[in-house]
Curated annotation (Swiss-Prot):
Keywords: Cytoplasm, Electron transport, Iron, Metal-binding, Transport, Zinc
Binding site for Fe(3+) 2: E53, E94, E128, H131
Function per UniProt: May provide oxidative stress protection via catalytic reduction of intracellular hydrogen peroxide.
Paired cysteines (S-S): none
GO molecular function, one term: oxidoreductase activity
Pfam families attached to this UniProt entry: Rubrerythrin, RUBY_RBDX
Lineage: Bacteria, Pseudomonadati, Thermodesulfobacteriota, Desulfovibrionia, Desulfovibrionales
Record-listed Fe(3+) 1 binding positions: E20, E53, E97, E128
A single GO cellular-component term on record: cytoplasm
Organism the protein comes from: Nitratidesulfovibrio vulgaris (strain ATCC 29579 / DSM 644 / CCUG 34227 / NCIMB 8303 / VKM B-1760 / Hildenborough)
Name the UniProt record assigns to this protein: Rubrerythrin
């Protein structure tokens, strides 16, 4: 691959790296808040997403060739709010990344002859779209009071011990390990 030095793509990589790195930290902070708010599954989703953002940043960082590079970029300077607000803010950031930032960065990389980097930008955008959907789905569940309650009987799994409960809602305490309702999630069987 030809050198990135002085290209717009080099600046875009560093901008995306900085954004992914900051998102990782925000998601770790938001995960802590979710746990405080009684949403262990959402806390774990924030942690998982933070790890995925770290991997995006690492992939991008490996393209850089060293030295100092000045970029001008705006990043969210928000606060740690309640879990619902944190999910909405996170979804907005992911939306920007997959609808505007990464498609633009991929186009510029192609124009400058960096096809591999363009593919990476486009691939990261796919992950960001999934992140947005998941954040919005959890936000909707909080707003509608559906995190631990459903109209139809379903199966709920304790994330701490694996106990499975069937009913319209998660139990207040797990009968197997005595952990609170915060540790339950809908049982998802994807194998």
């Amino acid at each position: 691959m030809k050198s990135l030095k002085g290209s717009r793509t080099e600046k875009n990589i560093l901008t995306a790296f900085a954004g992914e790195s900051q998102a990782r930290n925000r998601y770790n902070y938001f995960g802590g808040q979710a746990k405080k708010d009684g949403f262990v599954q959402i806390s774990d989703i924030f942690a998982e997403t933070a790890d995925q953002e770290r991997e995006h940043a690492k992939r991008l960082f490996k393209f850089l060739e060293g030295g100092d590079l000045e970029i001008v970029a705006a990043f969210p300077a928000g606060i740690i709010a309640d879990t619902h607000a944190n999910l909405i803010a996170s979804a907005a950031g992911e939306h920007h990344e997959y609808t505007e930032m990464y498609p633009s960065f991929a186009r510029i990389a192609r124009e400058e002859g960096y096809e591999e980097i363009a593919r990476v930008f486009a691939s990261i955008a796919v992950a960001e779209e999934f992140h947005e959907k998941r954040f919005l789905d959890f936000a909707r569940n909080i707003k509608e009071g559906r995190v631990f309650l459903r109209e139809q009987a379903t199966k709920w799994r304790c994330r701490n011990c694996g106990y499975v409960h069937e009913g319209t809602g998660a139990p207040e305490l797990c009968p197997a390990c005595a952990h609170p309702k915060a540790h339950f999630e809908l049982l998802g069987i994807n194998w």
